[in-house]
Structure formats: structure tokens, C-alpha cells
Amino acid sequence: MNLPKQLFHWFEQRQSKLCHRQLLVITGKKEWTINAAKALSCNQDIQRVLWVGDDLVEYENISIKDYRSKLGQEYDWVVLNCFSGFRANAAVALSGTIKAHGIMVILCPDLFEWPDYADPEQLNRISYGYQHKHVNSFFIQHLISSFSTNSSVAKLSADRFSGKLFFVDDNLDKERYTEQQIAVQSIRKVAQGHKNRPLVLTADRGRGKSSALGIAAAELMQSTVKTICLTAPHIRTVEQVFFHIKRLLPDELQAPIIITFIQ
């Protein structure tokens, strides 16, 4: 499929150095946007792709209403097919599952047509007692305006690509690990200190809370704490916690560990 050369140059530059997470908006006819996203994902070194809104067998996929089942997991790409419906809550929540250097891809109609698009999710936004009728979406208009004014948003259409690069500053990378170390130390201090002194760990989605819990749990299991109770709305939301526990625990300590899921 023919795509603008500037797009491939943009991806090549992104692969050359660690970049911030970015949004790529692909606009046009439904079939073309889907094929463009599939072609791009095949050309990139991507391990995990989550496709939201279509039942595409070659990718891990969910309907947009099931977005909560993926919270706590990590993906290189999250593709949000807005032709199947758009939910702002889902888009914001799933943005937190994107790994460092990753991309969220939004597939949508041409931007001047999108506000008038008959969104399948519109039925879920109608209050009881009101009849459904198609209306122009002011929120989509606001979203499109945000795309235009935010220089970090890359945009692709059938005949044009525009996008800037946002590399991660070396000092910023060091500060990230410093904050994580403080979080891990705080968790250990609470677990090994006086009883009934809780710790509240807050951060935006996708900023490493689960990773910090996993690192702290592995360190605690090598010292005095042998029983840890972890609660979550879904088993998959704590995958990163157990990933870091297994990564950091010595082999001789992993064998006797018993993990029990209680629902």
C-alpha cells in the first residue's frame, strides 16, 4: 500500500532513539484506515498490539465496552477504531496501557466529516425516555480542535502526513527511576513498620504503580514478609506486578511460592 515517505522517515527516526508516547491519527475511509494501520504495524518491530473495536484475528482485540479488562497490561501499540464507536473514558484509560516509546493509533473518518458520523456508541449516551436521533458531536469537534493545536499529535491521510518527533531527555529518564525507587522504599517501609499505617500511591495511568508494587513485593519476599495479599478488579490488571516478582526473585525462592487467586 502506498503511504507518504515522510511517515516511514518519522518511524525510522523514532526507532533511532527513545521517544515519548505519541498519538497517531489516521483519517479517511474505514477500509483504508484499517489497512494503513495493519501495514504500519507489520513494518515495525512491535511485540504487542491491542486492537479496540474490531474482531481482527491477527491481533489481540476487544470491543470498546470491555476496555477495563486490559487495564494494568502493557502494549507497544493500542489501535482505537472509532468507526466501531468512540468512548472518551476508554481512550483515556487505554492510553495508560501504552509502554514507553509506544503509540496510540486512532482510526476515524476525515476530520471534517467525523462530527457528523453516526457513532454506534451514541445509543449508549442517550438518557432514558429520550428518542435516538443523530446529532452533530460537539465533543468530537473539540477533540479535532485539540488534534490541530497539539504539535505532538501525528496525522495521516491518504495523501499527507504531518508529525514531529519528541525524544526523551536523558535527565528525564534518570528522574523517572529516582521516583520509582522512592515509591519502592515507601512500600517497604510501610510493610515492615508499624501496623495500621497505610500508604497511598498515586500517579496517572501507565506511570509504573504496578511495577513499583512488584519490585517492592520481590524485595519483601526475600526478607521478612512472606505473605502478601494483592487485590484488584481483574486478575489481568496485576500482570505487571507478578512479572516483576518473577523477574527479581532468585530461582530458589520462586519454587516454593504459592500464588492463589480468590474471586
Task: Label the model's feature ranges.
Residues S69-L165:
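N-terminal accessory nucleic-acid engagement/regulatory domains that precede
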Residues N2-F11, L172-R197:
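N-terminal pre-P-loop "Q-motif" helix
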